Amino acid sequence: MHATTVKNKITQRDNYKGIMSVIVVVLLLTLTLIAIFSAIDQLGISEMGRIARDLTHFIINSLQD
């Protein structure tokens, strides 16, 4: 009986760790997206167009090599 209780507590702790890991990852992704959109907002639309064009050229040139 005692071994089963210990095993259940270990399983609960593992489940808790897994849930906390997912929560931390979601929070980090959310903060990253907020930072990206904030940077995009500060750059403005014309800057984003230039960056997108440069990035497209870079990707195309990388694929041609």
UniProtKB/Swiss-Prot annotation:
The keyword Cytoplasm does not apply. The chain crosses the membrane at residues 19-39. It is found in: Cell inner membrane. Keywords: Cell inner membrane, Cell membrane, Membrane, Signal-anchor, Stress response, Transmembrane, Transmembrane helix. GO terms for cellular component: plasma membrane. Signal peptide: none annotated. Its main location: membrane. Residues 1-18 are cytoplasmic. Disulfide bonds: none annotated. The keyword Transmembrane applies. Residues 40-65 are periplasmic. Induction: By acid stress, via the EvgS/EvgA system. InterPro entries: SafA. It is a single-pass type II membrane protein. Coiled coil: none annotated. It holds the Pfam family SafA. Connects the signal transduction between the two-component systems EvgS/EvgA and PhoQ/PhoP, by directly interacting with PhoQ and thus activating the PhoQ/PhoP system, in response to acid stress conditions. Interacts with PhoQ. Belongs to the SafA family. This is Two-component-system connector protein SafA. The gene is safA.
